[in-house]
């Protein structure tokens, strides 16, 4: 579809009581403006013009990688003035879609309907009917067709009774829009250039104005304060949870589940309460996720159990694995099939072989660990000397006793045994027992120190 988009994002957001621009506050882990940008990109917008004002440096630092044209509105003189800053970029014959960076939930379906509804030479306008329209511009109709929009502060008492309100989202042709914007005046209670005045201008020219309703009213709710943002967050999460339930995912309590990215699921998935999904997560068949887990950018294969309060980021977990409770898998962690990682174990940049176990109180970093290895409680791969990192290599069928330190770089051969409490600084051969302990010393009739 041949259209360009303008996203208005210049507002300061005073009621957020924040040092950053309002549209950078996140919903589902993503800046509100990014939600709107993604909607435009999903529909194939030819150009996306982002109109910014306050906090320009922060805006570009956060959204600088996006495919947008940056348009500065140095003075905030109204919505019409804001769109007009981008108007030199409009092609005369293209559709121009106007959206808002603080209205993050607008859907592709609603935008498609709006684009399709634009009459030739006219305007398609997104409206909604509210029980309490206080604060919004009212839609003025004459015998059916829309003829104008009147803002709350300029409305008569009779007009204030109207419940159909303007969302601000609209579509017009670029050439017409440029002409109407250039003719705007600021003769109103706010002293601003209202975008909504182009509706009356179009009507005066005999152009049709087509009103379209959103798929869901929540889509057009804006954010002015943190309470409104929290409300939209819950609405968004409820919708995501409902989709997963309909796809066969068992959410034990849909109201206590947060999806802040994308989730690909197999069959018979079970997710307990207070689980957070971030980035891109893939779950195979029959995966169970315990309460309080955080999963980010990870893949978990079939028949694996993630026990409560585990944090998994940038990791790959094979089939029939058990993780947790209270496990941390960091980027580069790879658990092969039937591996087990237990409570208070941290794993980073490690391949843990098939059937291997590290069940208690262990740090494994920068290591290659073979099959059927048993890593005892309190084992540490000492991978960092204060300047550089080094690798530990452990062969198949190795037993590493509790409270051992493996000082990298070091290699432990297949079938070797490391006695509990050992510090390993040199390579250990296959099937070798390595043990290093200080000689025990005993003092009879020992007297403990007493307080003075």
Curated annotation (Swiss-Prot):
The protein's role, per its UniProt record: Catalyzes the last two sequential reactions in the de novo biosynthetic pathway for UDP-N-acetylglucosamine (UDP-GlcNAc). The C-terminal domain catalyzes the transfer of acetyl group from acetyl coenzyme A to glucosamine-1-phosphate (GlcN-1-P) to produce N-acetylglucosamine-1-phosphate (GlcNAc-1-P), which is converted into UDP-GlcNAc by the transfer of uridine 5-monophosphate (from uridine 5-triphosphate), a reaction catalyzed by the N-terminal domain.
Pfam families noted in UniProt: Hexapep, Hexapep_2, NTP_transf_3
InterPro entries: Bifunctional_GlmU, GlmU-like, GlmU_C_LbH, Hexapep, Hexapep_transf_CS, MobA-like_NTP_Trfase, Nucleotide-diphossugar_trans, Trimer_LpxA-like_sf
One of the record's GO molecular function terms: magnesium ion binding
Region (Linker) residue spans: 227-247
Pathway(s) this gene product operates in, as recorded in its UniProt entry: Nucleotide-sugar biosynthesis; UDP-N-acetyl-alpha-D-glucosamine biosynthesis; N-acetyl-alpha-D-glucosamine 1-phosphate from alpha-D-glucosamine 6-phosphate (route II): step 2/2; Nucleotide-sugar biosynthesis; UDP-N-acetyl-alpha-D-glucosamine biosynthesis; UDP-N-acetyl-alpha-D-glucosamine from N-acetyl-alpha-D-glucosamine 1-phosphate: step 1/1; Bacterial outer membrane biogenesis; LPS lipid A biosynthesis
Binding sites annotated in the UniProt record for Mg(2+): 102, 224
Record text on cofactor binding: Binds 1 Mg(2+) ion per subunit.
Family, as annotated: In the N-terminal section; belongs to the N-acetylglucosamine-1-phosphate uridyltransferase family. In the C-terminal section; belongs to the transferase hexapeptide repeat family.
Entry keywords, A to Z: Acyltransferase, Cell shape, Cell wall biogenesis/degradation, Cytoplasm, Magnesium, Metal-binding, Multifunctional enzyme, Nucleotidyltransferase, Peptidoglycan synthesis, Repeat, Transferase
Protein residues bound to acetyl-CoA: 377, 383-384, 402, 420, 437
Subunit structure: Homotrimer.
Cellular localisation: Cytoplasm
Region (Pyrophosphorylase): 1-226
Catalytic activity, EC: 2.7.7.23, 2.3.1.157
Enzyme class: transferase
Annotated catalysed reactions: alpha-D-glucosamine 1-phosphate + acetyl-CoA = N-acetyl-alpha-D-glucosamine 1-phosphate + CoA + H(+); N-acetyl-alpha-D-glucosamine 1-phosphate + UTP + H(+) = UDP-N-acetyl-alpha-D-glucosamine + diphosphate
Active site: 360 (proton acceptor)
GO biological process, one term: UDP-N-acetylglucosamine biosynthetic process
Region (N-acetyltransferase) residue spans: 248-452
Gene coding for it: glmU
Protein name from the UniProt record: Bifunctional protein GlmU
NCBIfam families, per database record: glmU (TIGR01173), PRK09451.1 (NF006986)
